[in-house]
């Protein structure tokens, strides 16, 4: 033991001495300890010296080594410059390509949503809703297979694609449906819809048998067990893209894409009547602030009647969020009018006041009755009071100028001409592109009223006549007294003010807004710019209302393919000179005919320096307005805040 201890003791001091030698020597010599960076640089120099020595041993002189190093350095610099040029060129090409494929927007109204964007959103959503498919978000967009979305244990179950097969197909399953769905699901199943039966041959036999022998809830669990991200996703045929890359490339607004995907993820909560109303609003089948509000309230009554409260929640808490999904879709048809916004706020307030202990059936019935009462009080009775108040301003043999079409103005003029037997003359001023005044002029003419119809371009001639009053409708009246109405109203009111013709505005208090606006740029609505372009579409698919980003892209690609195919099939040359000459003459004649028939604004989307803006509304300053006639009486525009306080208190 003593020998081993002695050996160990004798062995340890040398190692310690070796470890302490550098520091002690460095301290003795007064040198600093090298840092890691300096050590790495020293090792690098040692390696370089070794390589130089090896090259020199192989017969390469130091001068040659320096020349090789310089050449290598110059080569790297050249490669770096070429790489930068390629990156800059690619960046410019991508920027140019992005500008070409982006939806054209005016720099002044670039913050507003365009009609193309709204229609593309509706197209994407209706494609997803009308097809019985489940969705998932991929790099190419939101992909939907043929089989319905079914998540095990989820409250979202869309089984519209489960086609009934077999003798037990008539039975239905109500337990598997969520509480929020109003449709009954077929109990027996069937794996795929009839429209994709040809694609179902690729499905493995085991999965077909499993789906065919299961009910709807079992199909849901089976589909939930399939990993949509894995390769097994191929067992479900009929993949189609709802938001393809074309749509994403058309929009440079990321928030728009996210809102579209949000709508698609909640597509199972959209009521069919909301889809129908959205289509009517987007295609301008329902025009006007009050008609749009009445249509929305009627549809909300249907939605509330069909609504079923999910388990574990109450109607007063869940119905508000359920209606929010419907409202999000309505906003994509057209921006909500002020009357629609005020009605929605009132409805949500009424829902929040429902007692949670009230049965759902009684609460829904009471809510639908309140909606009907609200429409009657705030719209029908308000219009009747406005007609009574405004009739006192109209005397015998009065000439009245109106602009566009207004529900309350039409009823006012009919009441004075028919009920009160007043001999009045009405001049209906109209403008492109909606020509709303035509409907009003036709209604008055059919009732026997003396009507003159004119466009807004002849305004100077109209006011040179003996005009007594200018009656205007309103989309909204802001809290600072400005009138927010259809484009052209401000010009009409200003021209009347210059000629000392009183301007009277008939407006329900439901149209009053607490928003303050000084120009029509900050907040407005953009309509389709093609409505301002006088294009006679030969193809009915290209008419307004059927246009969309996806459809336009498809038509453009088809035209390009046809043109390319025609160029490929075109003969290389002509053997007969006379034939060539006759073809040249016919070609010149056709080109001349096309140039004569072509509109100057055709293909304006391809011109980068041209933007066509079709705004729907403008602002009329309060100094141009003499009175605002409401159900509370005739008031100056400065009294709008008082009415807002009264309306808010009564609501």
Swiss-Prot record:
Entry keyword annotation includes RNA-binding: no
Pfam families registered for this protein in UniProt: IF-2B
GO terms assigned for molecular function: enzyme regulator activity; translation initiation factor activity
Cellular component terms per the entry's GO annotation: cytosol; eukaryotic translation initiation factor 2B complex; guanyl-nucleotide exchange factor complex
Listed Low complexity bias regions: 11-28
Function: Acts as a component of the translation initiation factor 2B (eIF2B) complex, which catalyzes the exchange of GDP for GTP on the eukaryotic initiation factor 2 (eIF2) complex gamma subunit. Its guanine nucleotide exchange factor activity is repressed when bound to eIF2 complex phosphorylated on the alpha subunit, thereby limiting the amount of methionyl-initiator methionine tRNA available to the ribosome and consequently global translation is repressed.
Family of this protein: Belongs to the eIF-2B alpha/beta/delta subunits family.
Protein name: Translation initiation factor eIF2B subunit delta
């Amino acid at each position: 033991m003593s020998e081993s201890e002695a050996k160990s003791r004798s062995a340890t001091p040398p190692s310690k001495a070796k470890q302490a030698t550098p520091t002690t020597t460095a301290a003795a010599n007064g040198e600093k300890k090298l840092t890691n960076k300096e050590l790495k640089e020293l090792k690098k120099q040692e390696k370089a010296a070794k390589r130089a020595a090896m090259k020199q041993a192989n017969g390469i002189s130091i001068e040659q080594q320096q020349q090789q190093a310089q050449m290598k350095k110059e080569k790297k610099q050249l490669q770096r410059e070429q790489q930068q040029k390629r990156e800059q060129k690619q960046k410019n090409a991508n920027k140019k390509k992005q500008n070409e494929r982006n939806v054209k927007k005016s720099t002044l109204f670039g913050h507003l949503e365009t009609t193309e964007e709204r229609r593309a959103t509706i197209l994407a959503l209706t494609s997803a809703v009308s097809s019985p498919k489940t969705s998932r978000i991929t790099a190419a967009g939101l992909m939907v297979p043929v089989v319905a979305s079914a998540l095990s244990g989820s409250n979202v179950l869309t089984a519209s694609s489960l086609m009934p097969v077999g003798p037990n197909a008539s039975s239905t399953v109500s337990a598997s449906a969520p509480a929020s769905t109003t449709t009954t699901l077929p109990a027996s199943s069937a794996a795929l819809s009839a429209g994709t039966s040809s694609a179902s041959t690729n499905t493995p036999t085991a999965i077909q048998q499993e789906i065919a022998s299961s009910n709807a809830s079992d199909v849901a669990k089976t589909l939930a067990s399939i990993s949509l991200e894995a390769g097994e996703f191929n067992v479900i045929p009929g993949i189609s893209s709802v938001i393809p890359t074309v749509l994403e490339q058309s929009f440079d607004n990321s928030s728009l894409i996210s809102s579209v995907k949000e709508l698609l993820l909640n597509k199972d909560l959209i009521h069919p009547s909301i889809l129908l109303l959205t289509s009517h609003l987007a295609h301008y089948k329902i025009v006007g602030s009050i008609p749009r509000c009445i249509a929305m309230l009627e549809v909300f009554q249907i939605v509330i009647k069909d609504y079923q409260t999910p388990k574990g929640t109450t109607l007063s808490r869940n119905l508000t969020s359920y209606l929010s999904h419907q409202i999000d879709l309505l906003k994509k048809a057209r921006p909500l009018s002020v009357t629609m916004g005020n009605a929605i706020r009132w409805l949500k307030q009424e829902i929040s006041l429902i007692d949670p202990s009230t049965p759902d059936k009684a609460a829904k019935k009471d809510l639908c009755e309140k909606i009907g009462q609200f429409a009657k009080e705030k719209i029908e009775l308000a219009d009747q009071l406005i007609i009574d108040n405004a009739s006192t301003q109209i005397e015998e043999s009065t000439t009245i100028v109106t602009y566009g079409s207004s529900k309350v103005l039409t009823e006012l003029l009919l009441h004075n001409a028919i009920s009160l037997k007043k001999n009045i003359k009405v001049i209906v001023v109209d403008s492109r592109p909606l020509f709303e005044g035509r409907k009003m002029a036709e209604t008055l003419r059919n009732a026997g009223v003396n009507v003159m119809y004119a466009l807004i371009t002849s305004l100077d001639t109209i006011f040179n006549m003996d005009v007594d009053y200018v009656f205007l409708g309103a989309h909204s009246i802001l809290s600072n007294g400005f009138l927010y109405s259809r484009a052209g109203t401000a010009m009409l009111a200003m021209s009347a003010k210059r000629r000392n013709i009183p301007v009277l505005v008939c407006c329900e208090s439901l149209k009053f807004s607490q928003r303050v606006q000084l120009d029509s740029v900050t907040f407005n609505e953009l309509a389709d710019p093609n409505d301002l372009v006088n294009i006679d579409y030969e193809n009915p698919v290209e008419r307004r209302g059927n246009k969309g980003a996806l459809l336009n892209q498809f038509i453009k690609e088809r035209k390009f393919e046809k043109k390319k195919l025609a160029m490929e099939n075109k003969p290389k040359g002509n053997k007969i000179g006379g034939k060539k000459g006759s073809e040249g003459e016919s070609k010149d004649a056709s080109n001349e005919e096309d140039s004569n028939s072509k509109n100057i604004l055709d293909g304006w989307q391809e011109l980068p320096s041209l933007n066509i803006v079709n705004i729907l509304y403008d602002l009329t300053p309060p100094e141009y307005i003499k009175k605002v006639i409401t159900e509370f009486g005739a008031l100056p525009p400065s009294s709008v805040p008082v009415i807002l306080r009264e309306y808010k208190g009564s609501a």
